[in-house]
């Protein structure tokens, strides 16, 4: 064996020893049934997710456009094609229209989500209100959220549909939950590392104290603000490092942000998209 081959084999063996990152695919705002829904974008996203083989797929709401049963059935038909044993889904404001939350519960179960796996804790809540666009977590849920995060974990994730922080280009009103400040304080006390949300179709990332808030765009509709494109997030959680990518169906990915959970040092990509930047 020549030295180069030996070195390559040694490097390969060393690489195989390293623990693989825990991968989360984060999609949002499918809006099945909308006139702006693009089936081939959702088809492609499903194919890409199955090729990615994530450990968890998270869907942060607005599966439907008006909360109708046929829209839920359409959304579910796509989500059922995703080959991942851990699928966490929370409803959005569109899903709560026309008493749509009853169909959500019939097809997806509880409107709250919990997963404790591989040192990771993920807790999701329903922030929607029936027939209203604004959202709230609600004081009655704070104790429950705290209880779910008491389990020992290396990395904690909170998921909901609405924003807890403003996102550029999303305008006023309805983008943040009414009790954003209170729930942020709860999450800070729980030592949550990351918040995942959707709602206004603008992908973005913020750091607030020790928490990183990451918003997803719409994965498969043309309800787009400015120059934003359909996309979803891919999150890689490794040894004291978290890297978040924005993936465009049929196209490449852009780095959004990379951070160290223990020091909260971070590097934000210039490619972070806003409605005024293409």
Placement of each model-derived feature along the sequence:
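Short acidic, glycine-rich surface-loop motifs adjacent to enzyme active sites
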Residues: 152-169
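Active-site neighborhood of phospho(di)ester-bond hydrolases with catalytic His/Asp-centered motifs
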Residues: 26-28, 56-62, 87-93, 126, ...
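Conserved beta-sheet core of the metallophosphoesterase superfamily
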Residues: 172-243
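Beta-strand-turn-beta hairpins that frame and shape the catalytic cleft
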Residues: 15-25, 114-124, 150-155, 207-212
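Extended active-site neighborhood of metal-dependent phosphoesterases/phosphodiesterases
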Residues: 3-11, 15-16, 69-147, 182-188, ...
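N-terminal active-site segment of His-dependent metallophosphoesterases
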Residues: 1-78
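Active-site environment of divalent metal-dependent phosphoester hydrolases
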Residues: 32-36, 65-70, 74, 93-101, ...
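A short C-terminal boundary segment appended to hydrolase-like catalytic domains
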Residues: 1-9, 18, 238-278
């Amino acid at each position: 064996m020549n030295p180069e081959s030996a070195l390559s084999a040694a490097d390969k063996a060393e690489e195989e020893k390293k623990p693989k990152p825990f991968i989360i695919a984060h999609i949002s705002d499918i809006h099945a049934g909308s006139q702006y829904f693009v089936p081939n974008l959702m088809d492609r996203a499903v194919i890409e997710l199955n090729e990615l083989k994530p450990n968890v797929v998270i869907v942060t709401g607005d599966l439907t456009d008006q909360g109708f049963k046929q829209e839920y059935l359409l959304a579910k038909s796509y989500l059922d094609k995703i080959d991942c044993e851990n699928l966490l889904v929370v409803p959005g404001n569109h899903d709560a229209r026309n008493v749509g939350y009853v169909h959500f519960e019939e097809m997806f179960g509880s409107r709250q989500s919990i997963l404790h796996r591989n040192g990771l804790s993920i807790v999701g809540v329903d922030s929607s209100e029936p027939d209203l666009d604004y959202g709230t977590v609600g004081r009655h849920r704070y104790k429950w959220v705290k209880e779910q995060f008491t389990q020992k974990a290396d990395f904690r994730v909170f998921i909901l549909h609405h924003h807890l922080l403003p996102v550029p280009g999303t305008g006023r009103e309805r983008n943040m939950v009414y009790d954003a400040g209170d729930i942020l304080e709860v999450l800070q006390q729980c030592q949550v590392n990351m918040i995942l949300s959707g709602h206004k179709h603008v992908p973005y990332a913020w750091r607030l104290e020790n928490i990183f808030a990451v918003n997803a765009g719409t994965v498969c509709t043309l309800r787009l603000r400015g120059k934003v494109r359909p996309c979803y997030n891919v999150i890689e959680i490794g040894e004291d490092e978290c890297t978040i990518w924005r993936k465009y169906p049929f196209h490449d990915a852009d780095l959004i942000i990379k951070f160290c959970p223990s020091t909260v040092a971070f590097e934000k990509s210039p490619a972070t998209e806003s409605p005024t930047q293409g």
